[in-house]
């Protein structure tokens, strides 16, 4: 007999449901799905109709490939003003957050992404105080930024409120970052927010975006990087998600080229392993503005050695050795982008 899974939102989300629908343009409803029976998914959220009970991630950004996880239970499906949102319980990676058919995080390996995109930039400068996060609606980057005791202010601008609410509901250990009193959440367009930010406001800007399609496309374009550079203090740093060297070398080359023209300090590409991302890895572009020299490859603010780690969730992935190793590129990538770094 086919097993059914029914989505029921907790009362905390139900209380805000009507207001959220009016102000953010999304609707949330209970969903039933015949997981074991392998029903086709007309909404395009990526549930495979070829292998019953499996989620398959298929995208034109990685043609000829499919990445699959076995589904135990569909926990949530909804559609916001911007994208389709799904959460399911997998057999081997815990709960999984999916946006427009693309895996954003799993409970098992989210640490490899969240810790690296945060600590690569913040451990490269002394005493960061003001940080802006663009995207990052799951709260994981906030959780990691909050480890740094020097931080006084954390702004986050996320375009999709459904991502925030769903993350708080289903991924509380990730979304715990929203509970930090230094955090100010703004629901809105990150591009517009940056344009309005006073010049030289931030020590670091972390861009936790999805792939350069849909609502995140602007976050990979030259005008956006110009806004980031303007919002940073002299010697300030940016770290942005920068795709996979196995799949998107053309995109990476464009990002490196744009950043070299805009940021007058250091420009480096780093990477980390994330098993549930296409090709099993993801890259980061790290840039600094003109001012005090930033050597991204050698951390000056080693968070893994500080006493504050005794009182919070231990680091699972990041350490100072991995920090330095993250900038080592395989030969084919070094030939393509290594010479373009500064």
UniProtKB/Swiss-Prot annotation:
Its top-level enzyme class, in one word, is transferase
Organism annotation: Pisum sativum (Garden pea)
Q: Which residues form the active site?
A: 208 (proton acceptor)
One Gene Ontology term, aspect cellular component: cytosol
Gene Ontology MF terms? spermidine synthase activity
Q: Which UniProt keywords apply?
A: Polyamine biosynthesis, Spermidine biosynthesis, Transferase
Per the record, the pathway is: Amine and polyamine biosynthesis; spermidine biosynthesis; spermidine from putrescine: step 1/1
- NCBIfam families linked: PRK00811.1, speE
Q: Where does S-adenosyl 3-(methylsulfanyl)propylamine bind?
A: 83, 114, 138, 158, 189-190, 208
Listed GO biological process terms: spermidine biosynthetic process
- Which HAMAP family does the UniProt record give? Spermidine_synth
Name of the protein in its database record: Spermidine synthase 2
Q: Which family does it belong to?
A: Belongs to the spermidine/spermine synthase family.
Domain of life, per the record?
Eukaryota
> Compositionally biased, Basic and acidic residues: which spans?
11-23
Catalytic activity from the UniProt record: S-adenosyl 3-(methylsulfanyl)propylamine + putrescine = S-methyl-5'-thioadenosine + spermidine + H(+)
Q: Where does putrescine bind?
A: 113, 208-211, 277
The record's region (Disordered) falls at 1-46
EC number(s) per entry: 2.5.1.16
A Pfam family of the record is Spermine_synth
Residue ranges of domain PABS in the record: 52-289
